Amino acid sequence: MRARIATTLCAVALALLPSCAPALSAKNPAQKPAPTADVAPKDPAAWRLEIPTPGLKSSLSFPTPSLLMLENGLRLYSLPTQASTLSLSVVIRHDVQILPNDKPGLAALTARMLTEGTTLHPDLKLAEAIEALGTDFAVDTGRDGTTISIEALPADLDTALALLAEVAIKPAFSPKMFDRVRAQWVDNVRESLQDPRSLSSIIGFEALLGKGLGAPVHGYPDALLRYTVQDIVRCHSTVYLPGNASLNVVGDFDPTKLTRLVQKHFGEWRKRAGAPRSILPTLPAATATHVLLLDRPRSPQSAIFVAHTLPARGAPGYADRELLVTAFGGLFTSRLNQNLRESKAYTYGAFGNYLATRHFGALAISTSVETKFTADAVREIVQELSDLALPNTPRPLVSDEVDRARADIVHSLVEHLGHTNRIAAALVQLFVHDLPLDQLAKLAAEIQAIPLDALRRTATEFITPTTLTIAIVGDAASIRPGLKALGYPVEDVQKLGDGESLQTPPM
C-alpha cells in the first residue's frame, strides 16, 4: 500500500514540474548566445616542438674512501654509508705485463672457475653456502683486472668476508668442473664471433693495439681448448696475490670491526713473488687510415668499427678527453648520432666512447648500417672526426653540445651515490689505475671547469682523422667498390690474431 502511494506522489510531482518553467511567447523569445570570434583549433602535437628545459643542476659531493694497507700488501678501500646492504669486492689487477701474451682469455677463464667450488666448500657446497646467505657472487674480467663482488646484509659481514676470501684465495679448480666450464665458455665465445658488431671490434682492436693488448678479453675458441687445469692453477698462483689486489667495502659497517674481520679472513693470504713483469708491448705505428674487411656474403647490413689510440686512464687530461668523446659520440644528441641517424638515416644508432685502460686508451666508434650506405657512413664518420679535430674547422665544438655532455657525466656520477655496488665499482678505478683517493670527488668539478677553447685544443691534439683503423664486417662484393673509391687501402681478413679461422656463414 505504501509503495503504491509513493509511486502516485512521484508521478504527480513529475507532472507538475513543467509548470515551474517560464512560458515562452512571441514577446519573450529564447535568448540566442552572442557570436564569438573564430579561433583556429589548437595543434595537438604543438607541444612536441617545445624542447623541455633542463631541471635543477645536481650537486655532487662524492665521499673520499679510507685506505688501509695490510702487512701482506692487500689494500683495503672502505667507505661507510647508511645503506641497508653492504657491497664487498676483491679486485685482482692483471694486464699484459703479467699475463702471458700467448694465452688470451686465460685470465677470464680462471676468474670464471673461482665460483665453482673452494677447498673448504667444494663443488655444490659453495652454492649452498651462498644461497644460505641469500646472495650471489658476480665475477667480471676486463682488460685491467678481475672483480669478484658480493652483496650482503650488515649482520652477515663476517660470513660474507669469509666466503669472499675463500673464493679469491682458495679455489678448488676441480678438473671435472673445469671441463664443463671450459666447454660452456668456448660455446659462448663462438656465439659472440657470429655477431658482426662483436667481430668488427675484435678485428679493429687487434689491428689497432697488436696481438697482446688487442686480443679479446674472453679469448679465442681454439686457444681456450688448449688450456688445461694446470694453466688455470698457474695463472692463479702468479696473479692472485695480496700485493696485486684490493678489497673494497661500501655500506653500513663499524670501521674497527671491519678491520678486525679483514685481518681475520684475508691476513692469512700469503705474500709471495708473482710472475716477472714483461716489457709493455709497443703499439703498432699507424701512418695512414686503412680498412680491414671481413666478408659476410649477402649480409643486409655492415658492422663498422672505427678507432684510433688515445692516452691511458692515468695520463694527465683524462677529464678533458672524457668530456670530448662524450660530446662527440657518447649521447643520442651527440653530433655523430645526429648525423648518421637523424640526418642521413643510415643507422639506428652511432656512438663513440673512450676506452681508457691502465696501459692505453682508444676512441672507439661503432655502428651498423644498411649495406648500400657502408661507404657513405664511413665517409661521414671520417668527416665528423675531421670537423672536430682539424685547426680552423668550420664546425668546432659549441657550448650547447658540450654542456649536454657535462650534465650527462655529472648526473651519472650522482647516480652512483644511490647504490653501494656502484660506489664500490667506482672505487675499483682508484686501485687499478693508481689514482689518488680524492680523484672521484674531484672529477665532477674538473668536468665542470673545462673551458670550451681548452676542449677544442684537446680535440686538435688527440684526434687524428688521417690515421684511423676501420674494421667492417659485411658483404664484401657489394661494399668493396665504394670503400676503394674513398681512397683507403682495403685488406681482407680471414683469420683472427691467434690464427683462428673466420668462416662467416652467408645470410
Predicted features by range, described:
Residues 184-203, 282-301, 338-347, 358, ...:
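Short acidic/His-enriched helical or mixed secondary-structure segments at domain edges of catalytic enzymes
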Residues 27-28, 32-46, 126-235, 284, ...:
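Acidic/histidine-enriched segments that form metal/cofactor-coordinating
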Residues 35-51, 217, 246-312, 472-507:
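An aromatic/glycine/proline-enriched structural segment found at the starts
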Residues 8-19:
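Bacterial N-terminal signal peptides
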Residues 201-202, 212, 229-265, 466-468:
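Non-catalytic, conformational "gating/processing" segments within enzyme and secreted inhibitor domains
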Residues 89-154, 194, 215-218, 331-346, ...:
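M16/MPP (pitrilysin/insulinase) zinc-metallopeptidase core fold and M16-derived inactive scaffolds
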Residues 43-68, 206-245, 277-282, 312-314, ...:
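Histidine-acidic residue clusters that define the catalytic metal-binding segment
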Residues 21, 116-120, 150-182, 331, ...:
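M16/insulysin-pitrilysin zinc metalloprotease superfamily fold
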